[in-house]
Amino acid sequence: MSSYSSDRDRGRDRGFGAPRFGGSRTGPLSGKKFGNPGEKLVKKKWNLDELPKFEKNFYQEHPDLARRTAQEVDTYRRSKEITVRGHNCPKPVLNFYEANFPANVMDVIARQNFTEPTAIQAQGWPVALSGLDMVGVAQTGSGKTLSYLLPAIVHINHQPFLERGDGPICLVLAPTRELAQQVQQVAAEYCRACRLKSTCIYGGAPKGPQIRDLERGVEICIATPGRLIDFLECGKTNLRRTTYLVLDEADRMLDMGFEPQIRKIVDQIRPDRQTLMWSATWPKEVRQLAEDFLKDYIHINIGALELSANHNILQIVDVCHDVEKDEKLIRLMEEIMSEKENKTIVFVETKRRCDELTRKMRRDGWPAMGIHGDKSQQERDWVLNEFKHGKAPILIATDVASRGLDVEDVKFVINYDYPNSSEDYIHRIGRTARSTKTGTAYTFFTPNNIKQVSDLISVLREANQAINPKLLQLVEDRGSGRSRGRGGMKDDRRDRYSAGKRGGFNTFRDRENYDRGYSNLLKRDFGAKTQNGVYSAANYTNGSFGSNFVSAGIQTSFRTGNPTGTYQNGYDSTQQYGSNVANMHNGMNQQAYAYPLPQAAPMIGYPMPTGYSQ
């Protein structure tokens, strides 16, 4: 049974594109270094009686869904932690076929081997297909992209064909070029099956190809606010046909200061449109935006109503001083790189720190690359591609990559520098444990971060994580004014004793494996004993790494060509991810990691082999 019209051949070439950042680093994209983006756009005065009518409610409840009782629906929502607010919210769909998507959409879903809708898809699809405005609050990696893209395809198939000069029917606004690029990649596969066209426009890339896509006509446009405003101001596109608006990661767009641009863009769209807003958090600023842009909307919340992290992520917090971070990071990476699944993102606060840490790690033989807002788009794309394909399994990043970076098999996140807010902390660690997978987040928390300590403890408690006693001590010290300097934290030897003797765990990885296998009660008891003591040299000898593992630091960590224990995970005698000084010439010349092509943009900070120019 299918209540929707099948795909319709639009008869035009497919639009191509990939996303970039919405605004340039030097200011607005209008050509001026400073100014008011969108100042040339005039707020439209809409007369709904004069606008062409359009249809937006296509939902017909599947018979299997109609037979489901209210009690069964409530049980499902509780099991998936779905909270719904609003009037006349449809029942969630428990199976893909109950959504009645067109056959070619179902074919793509089948090829991707999805077993059942995620929670946000199950409840979001019926709402979106009913033509209702909605707010979806869900953690990253929850499947929200398909939650709005598949109803968008159904919506487009019920609208008149595009004519010459028409703008997009569906507009998706995203905060960063990385997120927009990933949305475009998802959209392209489904649009190809449905003979629709999508494109992505963003700053930091040539305008010509993006303008050509828009002139040919695209049904779906994924855009960052800055470049879209630039094109609207110079008349390269318009939003007269836009009847389906998506604000993806609305909280992030507000954090980045895009609210004025968003309001300018929304003023160009007819007020009877359908609007869907997606966010990982629900602060008052996002609530105000929803009140201004949405009408009689359904609010769907997945997970706890308060600030919460993905419960599939094991969170480990190490309270330490800034001067200790480098040594702790190296020892942690030695453990992580011994794993078969070792893809890791290390988050730092500044661009300078990103470059310095990347150079240091590569100089010491680690397969690390860095990404931040001052990198050229060509370099950023190349670095992300190397990371996604495992050629450089360590990515050092600023918050420019903390959202929108969707790599399925990231196993570890390390907060080298703690972010400015708990919201950013949640988004950072959300890069791991995508979909239903598990992951681990390590965080270095210093007394300088004391303003965030209470919020961090709340996030840990909500996720039923073990809480480092030092965090609780910082709360006490904050009240007594003893939070700064070494005097504000008790002797580290006590933690080392607790970890090595009472806890009985040799490494951070032992801690994780224990937490994964036992009850939350045991985990809570264990966490009170073990956090912070896992880096001492004593804990690395005669431990899980075998007798040939020596913990004197990175330059002596591989003394033999055939190490025993955990480090035998399929690695050859040269230790691909190791740091055997004998195998390193001038830092990186013998590393088996990819380098950009000679004609690629300069990769400052990455040592190049002979034959490659800097």
Curated annotation (Swiss-Prot):
The keyword Magnesium does not apply. This is Probable ATP-dependent RNA helicase DDX5. Its EC number is 3.6.4.13. InterPro entries: DEAD/DEAH_box_helicase_dom (IPR011545), Helicase_ATP-bd (IPR014001), Helicase_C-like (IPR001650), P-loop_NTPase (IPR027417), P68_rpt (IPR012587), RNA-helicase_DEAD-box_CS (IPR000629), RNA_helicase_DEAD_Q_motif (IPR014014). GO terms for molecular function: ATP binding; ATP hydrolysis activity; mRNA 3'-UTR binding; nuclear androgen receptor binding; promoter-specific chromatin binding; ribonucleoprotein complex binding; RNA binding; RNA helicase activity. It catalyses: ATP + H2O = ADP + phosphate + H(+). It comes from Mus musculus (Mouse). One of its GO terms (cellular component) is nuclear speck. Identified in the spliceosome C complex. Component of a ribonucleoprotein complex containing mRNAs and RNA-binding proteins including DDX5, HNRNPH2 and SRSF1 as well as splicing regulator ARVCF. Interacts with RBM4; the interaction occurs in an RNA-independent manner. Interacts with AGO1 and AGO2. Interacts with ESR1, AR, EP300, CREBBP, POLR2A, TP53, RUNX2 and HDAC1. Self-associates. Interacts with DDX17. Interacts with BRDT. The large PER complex involved in the repression of transcriptional termination is composed of at least PER2, CDK9, DDX5, DHX9, NCBP1 and POLR2A (active). There is a cross-link at residues 32, 45, 53, 340, 343, 388, 391, 411, 437, 451, 470, 523 (Glycyl lysine isopeptide (Lys-Gly) (interchain with G-Cter in SUMO2)). Residues 477-614 are annotated as: Transactivation domain. ATP binds at residues 114-116, 121, 138-145. The modification Phosphoserine is found at residues 24, 480. Belongs to the DEAD box helicase family. DDX5/DBP2 subfamily. There is a cross-link at residue 53 (Glycyl lysine isopeptide (Lys-Gly) (interchain with G-Cter in SUMO1)). Residues 1-39, 477-504 are annotated as: Disordered. Involved in the alternative regulation of pre-mRNA splicing; its RNA helicase activity is necessary for increasing tau exon 10 inclusion and occurs in a RBM4-dependent manner. Binds to the tau pre-mRNA in the stem-loop region downstream of exon 10. The rate of ATP hydrolysis is highly stimulated by single-stranded RNA. Involved in transcriptional regulation; the function is independent of the RNA helicase activity. Transcriptional coactivator for androgen receptor AR but probably not ESR1. It is found in: Nucleus; Nucleus, Nucleolus; Cytoplasm. Residues 1-15, 488-498 have a biased composition (Basic and acidic residues). The modification N6-acetyllysine is found at residues 32-33, 40, 236. Sumoylated; sumoylation, promoted by PIAS1, promotes interaction with HDAC1 and transcriptional repression activity. Sumoylation also significantly increases stability, and reduces polyubiquitination. Polyubiquitinated, leading to proteasomal degradation. Residues 125-300 form the Helicase ATP-binding domain. There is a cross-link at residue 53 (Glycyl lysine isopeptide (Lys-Gly) (interchain with G-Cter in SUMO)). A motif (Q motif) lies at residues 94-122.
